[in-house]
Amino acid sequence: MLNGKSKERNVPEPKLIARMAGRREDKMTELTNTQALKEKLTEAGVKYAIASYVDIHGVTKGKFVPVAHLGQMMEGSELYTGAALDGVPQDISDDEVAAMPDPDGLAICPWNRQLAWFPGNLFLSGEPFEACSRNILRRQLSNAADMGYRFNLGIETEFFLFRDTEDGGFAPLSDRDNLGKPCYDPRTLMDNLPIMDELVDAMNELGWDVYSFDHEDANGQFETDFKYADALTMSDRLVFFRMMANEIARKHGAFASFMPKPFADRTGSGAHYNMSLADLKTGENLFEPRGDDLHNCGISKIAYHFTAGVLKHGAAISAVIAPTVNSYKRLVRQGSMSGSTWAPVFMCYGSNNRTNMIRIPGMGGRIECRAADIACNPYLGSALILAAGLEGIREGLDAGAPHHENMYNYSDAEIAEQGIEYLPRNLGEAVEAFEADPLAKEVFGDAMFSSFVEYKKGEWESYQNHVSSWEVDRYLKMF
């Protein structure tokens, strides 16, 4: 009673009551699921959960949380100061971001089963943090879903296994790994098998379905190939793979390197993106031709449009999928004792042609972006490629005629006559193209776009100001 009158209550409308009840049910379901997950992890011997996210490089970061506190972790209890990491656009005075773990990405660490890793999405003040790499990809996946597509992705993981040497350098583990053409050498693969076997077992334990692995074209270089997945899952797996490979290598007195090109006279490590779109409802591969293969390359009309979009934005994309100064030492015609770098140099496409930015493998039904290297942030790389491809579909872009020939054999004049553009020659050119491309800003959002440009310009400037041993050796006593 107030002033002799009954106080009126704000009675919710029936629809609001239903929504409130739905939220309570959802909350109860979440609690039940979290409790079940907690029990599952405890039974598996897990002591700590890692609420993870990535920096601008796609390197996993996180805190260790005792499983007893899993419930609060799943609700975003773990807060992070973004300013402490490379390329996360926050100031030291900004509020912390919260990592919301994705239980679908759970991986119990095979090298230490006391640990469980969760990829996470960053939130700020209860809303998705726009500059979170994983959120950037999720936005583009949502755009694809609105068009009726699921984006499938397979990434080939090329990397090096090295040991530290007494002189402070590094070398391949095997003393037999010294061939000029070491690709597919079973002897050196056997010498590295203790590491590779444990790594492949770990990948299969996680359900990745490894179907081959081999010694690659550089000394100490290896590749693992495993089944494709949706782009978010595959990006999570690449981030986890880099951590896992290093941890397993350390157990054997070695280290894994994901530097794109550690040797000037050897091939570099790619992370070729094998891509297709599937019908969201039926799962049908929409890149498989059904009477609409315009150039007899083994892909559909929609795949040609997708390819055209990627090529249109190829220079900007390069800044993201070849993100380091060292990346552009890989994207050259010559620079390997084996006779070829196997890396793309031109923004064009062709069937089963490894000299193009976009290759269409022999079986068709997918396209492969060969410019991507193993140092990429897969969330950002796949987000920008997907956005470019979707633009190509929406606008019906024409990819032009394919190039089946070895593009390395053409002179600069012949390349120009055909209207073919080079990929950026260095990180500076790539970042300039990224900054000038409106699609890059649209995909990344204002804050992450500005942060990426600023960080990469700084990286390029730092390299430009460095005096290398090559310069000293060449010029110190020349004049």
Residue map of PLM features:
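N-terminal amphipathic/basic-hydrophobic helices that include classical n-h-c signal peptides
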Residues: 1-27
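ATP/Mg2+-dependent ligation/transfer catalytic cores
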Residues: 16, 24-215, 234-237, 254, ...
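A generic structural motif
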Residues: 55, 123-129, 188, 228-234, ...
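Short, solvent-exposed loop/turn segments at the edges of secondary structure
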Residues: 113-115, 154, 217-219, 268-272, ...
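Histidine-centered divalent-metal-coordination microenvironment in nucleic-acid enzymes
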Residues: 158-170, 215, 219-229, 259-283
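Alpha-helix capping and helix-loop boundary segments enriched in small/acidic/polar residues
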Residues: 186-190, 212, 229-236, 262-266, ...
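Gly/Pro-rich turn-and-neighbor structural signature
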Residues: 227, 234-240, 246-262
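Catalytic-core signal marking the mid-to-C-terminal active-site face
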Residues: 247-250, 254-255, 278-479
